A protein has these predicted regions:
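N-terminal leader/linker segments that initiate helical-solenoid repeat arrays
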Residues: 1-54, 58, 62
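Hydrophobic face of amphipathic alpha-helices that form TPR/SEL1-like repeat modules
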Residues: 34, 62-69, 102-111, 141-148, ...
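Structural signature of tandem alpha-helical TPR/SEL1-like repeats
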Residues: 38-45, 73-82, 116-126, 153-162, ...
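Short helix-capping/linker turns of helical repeat alpha-solenoids
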Residues: 40, 53-57, 69-71, 89-92, ...
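TPR/TPR-like (Sel1-like) alpha-helical repeat modules
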Residues: 197-208, 212, 216-219, 226-245
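Amphipathic alpha-helical repeat scaffolds
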Residues: 29-37, 49, 65, 84, ...
Length: 250
């Protein structure tokens, strides 16, 4: 189970919750997760460890997400161990926690995290499981895997399919990737109007790449737009603004 890699602070966990007690709310778990992520706060860490050891999938996922990028290698290992445990849960009650853990672990294995080596095949399996259960962020990362061919032959049709699912959930980065697909006719029929609408939507969320793409389209008269120096200038200023306020990755 996830308790195999427990490091210092375990002793204090036993004093956390007396008896079984009521299950903490999602908001409480989220708060503890944030406290552990930001400052490895001992009380929050002890509470989550106690619940995780008792088999709470939600606590296992929260603890894993909080620790997977920790500075201390022992805590990172513990985080990964809890994510593995939560991701493997197959009960209906633990399904939302399993999805969160699959996304977090899949992202870590896709992008690399600390000393964790990339493992594209495992990342694809985890993100695929979460995406099939309706997690839009997992769908976005699955789209990236198929678009770029990470550990697998590139598949533009699959990439566009998963970007479309993520885009419908209002993920600006997915809007941008799907817009590129429509612009290039990559995995979907070429459609400048659809691409333009998606670029605009991503730009409204201040995604710098989308704002910059619109600026160049106005400058060069692309995507069915007429060249427009004023619009180009306005979008260029907006690009600088967007770069100062980066969109949080899904």
């Amino acid at each position: 189970g996830g308790g195999a890699a427990v490091t210092g602070g375990a002793v204090g966990a036993a004093t956390g919750l007396r008896g079984a007690g009521p299950t903490p709310s999602t908001a409480q778990l989220d708060e503890w997760q944030a406290m552990v992520t930001q400052a490895t706060e001992p009380h929050a860490l002890a509470q989550l460890r106690t619940l995780a050891r008792r088999g709470s999938g939600a606590a296992q996922a929260a603890l894993g997400i909080a620790l997977v990028d920790a500075h201390e290698p022992g805590l990172r290992d513990e985080g990964r161990s809890w994510l593995e445990t939560a991701a493997a849960a197959d009960s209906k009650a633990d399904a939302p926690a399993a999805r969160r853990a699959q996304l977090a672990l899949g992202k870590a294995l896709l992008l690399g995290s600390g000393d964790l080596p990339k493992d594209y095949a495992r990342a694809r399996a985890l993100l695929g499981a979460a995406a099939e259960q309706g997690d839009p962020a997992a769908a976005y990362y699955l789209g990236l895997i198929y678009r770029s061919g990470y550990g697998i032959a590139a598949d533009p049709v699959q990439a566009a399919h998963w970007f479309d699912i993520a885009s419908r959930a209002d993920i600006p980065a997915a809007d941008f990737m799907l817009a590129n697909a429509y612009r290039d006719g990559s995995g979907v029929p070429r459609d400048d109007a659809r691409a333009l609408a998606l670029y605009r939507r991503a730009a409204e969320h201040e995604l710098p790449e989308a704002v910059q793409t619109l600026a160049m389209a106005y400058r060069n008269g692309e995507l069915g737009l007429r060249p427009d120096a004023d619009e180009f200038h306005a979008q260029w200023i907006e690009t600088a603004h967007a770069l100062k306020h980066p969109v949080v990755a899904p």
